Amino acid sequence: MAAIRKKLVIVGDGACGKTCLLIVFSKDQFPEVYVPTVFENYVADIEVDGKQVELALWDTAGQEDYDRLRPLSYPDTDVILMCFSIDSPDSLENIPEKWTPEVKHFCPNVPIILVGNKKDLRNDEHTRRELAKMKQEPVKPTEGRDMANRIGAFGYMECSAKTKDGVREVFEMATRAALQARRGKKKSGCLVL
């Protein structure tokens, strides 16, 4: 039996951990060096609830220089991973300011999973000290959940690509959301207008 194919697009601020999350999930290795992304595609097989799903993973660049390029990734998307970094309250602020309006414009009705990346840094002393200098602190789980409710996300997950904690669960939730999203339409997904 052929695998079901679904397309996942990951968005969020530059350096918030999108590419690492995809690489750890698809290749099981953590890249130690930061390389800003233009577009990279991976395919990963995942089984959820007894269904084999071939997940096409579309990476995107969060930097503003790519704001005009990024929409090319959106057509026919089945699920969006919208990421912020737990060590960057500013990246959480950009979820309702930038990412939600962009995604809802290009991908109306596509389920969104809000993902808090870099969970391992929440209790990291160095991270806490650096944030304290700016009168900030790491994002709390309740703040992530509240934001997910505010933007109407399908769900909220936290993970650490570095420790692999929660990584698989993020993609399992995303796959379930993509499978449920076939609400009787022939072709769900995004339009570029």
Swiss-Prot record:
This protein's record includes keyword Cell division: yes
How the protein is activated or inhibited is described as:
Regulated by guanine nucleotide exchange factors (GEFs) which promote the exchange of bound GDP for free GTP, GTPase activating proteins (GAPs) which increase the GTP hydrolysis activity and GDP dissociation inhibitors which inhibit the dissociation of the nucleotide from the GTPase. Activated by GEFs such as ARHGEF2, ARHGEF3, ARHGEF28 and BCR. Inhibited by GAPs such as ARHGAP30. Inhibited by GDP dissociation inhibitors such as ARHGDIA.
UniProt PTM comment: Ubiquitinated by the BCR(KCTD13) and BCR(TNFAIP1) E3 ubiquitin ligase complexes, leading to its degradation by the proteasome, thereby regulating the actin cytoskeleton and synaptic transmission in neurons. Ubiquitinated at Lys-135 in a FBXL19-mediated manner; leading to proteasomal degradation. Phosphorylation by PRKG1 at Ser-188 inactivates RHOA signaling. Phosphorylation by SLK at Ser-188 in response to AGTR2 activation.
From the UniProt record, list the reaction(s) this protein catalyses: GTP + H2O = GDP + phosphate + H(+)
Motif Effector region, residue numbers:
34-42
Protein name in the entry: Transforming protein RhoA
Ordered alphabetically, the record's keywords are:
Cell cycle, Cell division, Cell membrane, Cell projection, Cytoplasm, Cytoskeleton, GTP-binding, Hydrolase, Isopeptide bond, Lipoprotein, Membrane, Methylation, Nucleotide-binding, Nucleus, Phosphoprotein, Prenylation, Proto-oncogene, Ubl conjugation
| Gene behind this protein | RHOA
Please list the residues that bind GTP.
12-19, 30-37, 59-63, 117-120, 160-162
Q: Which GO terms describe its molecular function?
A: G protein activity; GTP binding; GTPase activity; protein kinase binding
